[in-house]
């Protein structure tokens, strides 16, 4: 006997949203511009928290880095950064999730600042032990202020997307 299991409309919508947000997060790095890529990926993380919940957002925050490493699109010197990138995305997601009900911007700024502080601390202290000085310096710059800027731009982009979606309803 064959048993057919049907998905509800809400389950189908959630799967479609997850797939769409994941696809955007995976393809954004192909733009090869940290400001654009980081802003898009962070916007996806904020949107995922709001539309799918924090567990799905954490998965979306982890998968692009892992896929980039496996597919060869991530430069080899950045592969040791993957755990730090995934952790910083989880920090952004957790802080935003915890504070978003108080106020969207309180959650967005808290998540952005904590993500930046984590990556800044990691780059300032640890990277000199992993890479030669020249490579460590360039990676430290990438993990510095651009992380805060792209997280805040991502929050703004997500907010504008939400406003646009609500105006279409």
Predicted ranges, named:
Residues 1-169:
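Loop-helix junctions at membrane interfaces
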């Amino acid at each position: 006997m064959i048993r057919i299991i049907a998905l509800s409309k809400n389950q189908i919508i959630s799967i479609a949203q997850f797939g769409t947000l994941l696809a955007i997060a995976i393809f954004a790095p192909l733009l090869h511009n940290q400001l654009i890529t980081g802003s898009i990926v962070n916007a996806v993380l904020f949107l995922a928290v709001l539309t799918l919940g924090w567990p799905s957002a954490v998965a979306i925050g982890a998968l692009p880095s892992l896929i980039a490493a496996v597919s060869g699109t991530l430069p080899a010197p950045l592969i040791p950064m993957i755990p730090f990138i995934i952790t910083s995305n989880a920090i952004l997601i957790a802080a935003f999730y915890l504070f978003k009900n108080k106020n969207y911007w309180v959650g967005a700024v808290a998540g952005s600042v904590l993500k930046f502080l984590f990556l800044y601390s990691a780059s300032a202290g640890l990277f000199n032990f992993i890479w030669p000085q020249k490579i460590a310096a360039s990676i430290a710059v990438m993990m510095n202020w651009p992380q805060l800027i792209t997280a805040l731009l991502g929050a703004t982009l997500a907010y504008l997307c939400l406003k646009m979606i609500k105006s279409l309803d």
